[in-house]
Amino acid sequence: MAQDIYVIDDDESSIPIFRELFKNDKEFKFIGVRTEQIDITLKNIPFLIIINEDSIDRDIASLCKQIRTDEDNQITPIIVVSSNTDKYHKLEVLEQSVEY
């Protein structure tokens, strides 16, 4: 059975990249959602959540906090993909218990 990996990406630019990278690995199913659809992601309790920070307009720390405070997703792994190299920004994101 495939593990659902939700990719939060408002312009859907990273979905094809992840699907191509894992095309030979049928264990993972990548599902793209927009930030306004976060409730769908939380309701389905995914195996992993990947957030493309460069494609969303929402504050990444508050989005991660929303995921972490959801009772069913407190331990769901979160990976943030970002081009932001600011050290303080990384620390702020890591404080929300995510991988950067």
Across the structure, where does each feature detected by a protein language model lie?
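Two-component/phosphorelay signaling modules centered on CheY-like receiver
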Residues: 11-36
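Alpha4 helix (beta4-alpha4-beta5 surface) of REC/receiver domains from two-component response regulators
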Residues: 58-62, 85-100
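His-Asp phosphorelay/catalytic-motif detector in bacterial-type signaling
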Residues: 45, 72-77
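Short acidic, S/G/P-rich loop/turn micro-motifs used as interaction or catalytic elements
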Residues: 11-14, 51-58, 84-87
